[in-house]
Amino acid sequence: MDEPVRQSYRPDVSFDGGDLDCGSGLLLLIRRHIDPLARGQILEVRSTELSVEQDLPSWCRLTGNELVSSSRNAGTWSFLVCKGSLAEKSESPAPTQPKLGAVRHVEETGISARASKPASILAIAPLSVMGIGSWPRPRWMLQAMHEHVEGRLGDAEFQATADDAVRLSVEAQLRSAVDIVTDGEQRRDNYASFVGGLLENCQLIPLTDLLPLVDDPEEFEKELLSLDVPASEVRHPAVFGKLRRGRPLAAHELEFTQSLTDRPVKIALPGPYLLTRIMWMECISDKVYATREELAGDIVQILREELHELLSAGAALVQFDEPVLTEVVFTGAKNSRSFMCGALSEKGSAEHELAFARELINQVVADVPLHRTAIHVCRGNWTRDESAALSGDYLPLVPTLKALNVGNYLLELCTPRAGEMEALKDLPQDRRVGIGLVNPKTEIVESLEEIIAKAKKAADLFGADRIFLNPDCGFATFADNPVCSSRLAEAKLSALARAAEILRAR
């Protein structure tokens, strides 16, 4: 390898990685220590593992950090890594040990499963209009999000900033005349991985840190680029201890949104199968959980507790996002990883995976009112490029959807990639269907005539009393990679609301 320039710098933070290599935990430790640093500050990594000499320079290049120097003494390497580049180094003195705010450790493994009575809520009216969940974040919100996840912005400051962003999101939805409101997921870095910053014994790390763990790092990096996924900005949860829900995942989102409007509020959560696929990674989670099923058991308990608390606090609807179900049926069993819908772990046959997903979802929603739960399924929302997303109708998923004990299906149906809605005609009569009638990925606002025609078709198929009107997916599933501007998102929701008004009058 190219020898770094050997200069003497005093590190701002130092840690000993022992004999860990880059594929078995060292990168997690580096990330924990380097994130809170300011750009230009220096981290010392001590290691006795020989392979680190070769692998660390590659990691530095991928992540945009500078390897300042390396030296070896009595079998122990010392690597000085500058966050960013030395040219950014400040002359002002730095704290000797920044606070590591990106991760929380606990030893307890028990997760309570408190069951509380759901608050009484009026049933959601037929033809109600609602978004799926996410809303484009303002630039200042994105900046606050990055600083917070890196430990450079405190919780209080972050929440105050997020409150302002939520106000803007809710105001836009109210101007659009939606019937059901969300907070726009303004506090989340993306629709699923955000839980990694809230659960104990879990850590959010950039996708670039995971490249050493995949079979073909170069091919995986090419896939991320082709999907418009910014690997250095999108963070992924890494599990390094027994998961524990020491604080709510979304109760604060619900409470604040309820303070802004009298309209019913929906909360979206990542589904248990999605979270299992995201969090189960060989060389990381298997050091804590013997099997994927064991990890899934803790995820189910966490989501059950969250669901009960949200319903007790008055959430009109709790939606579980499971877009990765389409990846199961439309890509088949693969021995390689894919970023489809944000899930990186490998999977088995479609039959096995769908059965596993059904079991997990039904465990989460057991013993709660059917009409207060929903499942959202789409074919990926990480890029505007329709050709890069999955295609196929719902027919392979209908048996699974029918077997889920949820009362509402919120589905992608506007894009031609989703096929014809007739594939869903056999869904249970006591369930309601949210019809995707606008595509968040397109630059045009669908015409009123187009929306009404498709909604009437859905009413003929399912019954007008069984349908809702919604977009295909969120407008900004990944915070740093929105598929729609806030102005366009508001226009699309407004079109849905106008269509609903006309349909109700007929």
What does each model-identified segment do?
Residues 93-506:
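Domain-level signal for soluble alpha/beta catalytic cores
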Residues 2-99, 456:
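Domain-level signature for proteins that mediate thiol-based redox and metal-cofactor handling
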